[in-house]
Amino acid sequence: MSPQTETKASAGFKAGVKDYKLNYYTPEYETKDTDILAAFRVTPQPGVPPEEAGAAVAAESSTGTWTTVWTDGLTSLDRYKGRCYHIEPVAGEENQFIAYIAYPLDLFEEGSVTNMFTSIVGNVFGFKALRALRLEDLRIPPAYSKTFQGPPHGIQVERDKLNKYGRPLLGCTIKPKLGLSAKNYGRAVYECLRGGLDFTKDDENVNSQPFMRWRDRFLFCAEAIYKAQAETGEIKGHYLNATAGTCEEMIKRAVFARELGVPIVMHDYLTGGFTANTSLAYYCRDNGLLLHIHRAMHAVIDRQKNHGMHFRVLAKALRMSGGDHVHSGTVVGKLEGEREMTLGFVDLLRDDFIEKDRSRGIFFTQDWVSMPGVLPVASGGIHVWHMPALTEIFGDDSVLQFGGGTLGHPWGNAPGAVANRVALEACVKARNEGRDLAREGNEIIREACNWSPELAAACEVWKEIKFEYEPVDKLDVK
């Protein structure tokens, strides 16, 4: 370019570095119904003002970079940039702030959780000006959520397929999770289903290993399902894990499951990836398969309170990507989960409309419109003494999954399943009669022991088993 020639793009261009807050901190901004809203927990480096830190997050997760570039003049930054529109200190924490950021909808590809996360939780998490950064919540506008299929079927369709109403569903993860042959694995599946469970489950790391190849497992589990159905008169299922090293192999396994006529398959959605998960969800919708989702690897992302991403965000992402069940913690078992916080994201999974409620960790009102709901799965270190609390906490629209709490029964797998089914039926009956499960739970279980020797034996084995540790991730002090 000659010294005399000046383009429109270069007319107002001045090279150099500007403070992010000059362009990306806009407290006067009024959010739009179509904006994706994010709440970030920001811990700035010493000497970095919170406004600059919040603006940096908005910039680096949208249109900004570390220096002024002349190509800024070739587009409308005001139209496309993220905006930090509010910052508030975190009560009880030093040098932590919640930064609220609004993103224009045009920044995101329709129907792609992958693209949404690549922007919002991409490189910005390694930004040096921040000591730590955590995405606490997202508001997904209906204009964006309607571009997703969501769960393949949803809660009501699943109940209709299974012909099971008015109670939580019961499951069991087959143990040991690794090392069984396919035939012995199928035997355990049959015994649990015959004893009264609705589902059994592959553990998250059961894929296709030398001791048990996936096709053999699928065949023996299908045989177990059909035999148990014939003997009990109930529809049964086993979560056949279709997770694989490639999307093509994953779909091949799902196709084989469909050919066997089983009702449900499974996917590890975080280790498998959102693109693979969405592909499988579309296949399941088109072919009548339910989809169970395991959240393996979630604690790497969500457990630390000041860095990463809260599970409520992963739960919303799963509902958009697609899944009929997802593991959600137990509150009372061996895995992380505070009660009010857990119930907050359980409602985000199941309900159509959820009001903002900071007492449960919900930062934004969320309207899912007509997107089907997801059944939360309570699993991990639970047994028959937990049944009243689980029934009271999670309600009917849930799956209560007992692995060791079924297979660890002193009389075997089928009696373990019987004990869990009897305990559940007793709790549902007591609740329907108006009894207080939280206060009378142990008494209800003891009464049921009088006519179920299987339950009595289970109660004796697990009467002293508790997991009383403080959760790492708790709600903020009010």
Curated annotation (Swiss-Prot):
The lineage of its organism: Eukaryota, Viridiplantae, Streptophyta, Embryophyta, Tracheophyta. Gene3D superfamilies: Ribulose bisphosphate carboxylase, large subunit, C-terminal domain, RuBisCO large subunit, N-terminal domain. RuBisCO catalyzes two reactions: the carboxylation of D-ribulose 1,5-bisphosphate, the primary event in carbon dioxide fixation, as well as the oxidative fragmentation of the pentose substrate in the photorespiration process. Both reactions occur simultaneously and in competition at the same active site. GO terms for cellular component: chloroplast. Its cofactor is Mg(2+). The keyword Acetylation applies. It is found in: Plastid, Chloroplast. GO terms for molecular function: magnesium ion binding; monooxygenase activity; ribulose-bisphosphate carboxylase activity. This is Ribulose bisphosphate carboxylase large chain. Substrate binds at N123, T173, K177, R295, H327, S379. Its EC number is 4.1.1.39. SUPFAM superfamilies: RuBisCo, C-terminal domain, RuBisCO, large subunit, small (N-terminal) domain. The modification N-acetylproline is found at P3. The modification N6,N6,N6-trimethyllysine is found at K14. Mg(2+) binds at K201, D203, E204. Coiled coil: none annotated. The record marks K334 as: Transition state stabilizer. It holds the Pfam family RuBisCO_large_N. Heterohexadecamer of 8 large chains and 8 small chains; disulfide-linked. The disulfide link is formed within the large subunit homodimers. It is an enzyme of class 4 (lyase). Binds 1 Mg(2+) ion per subunit. Residues 1-2 form a propeptide.
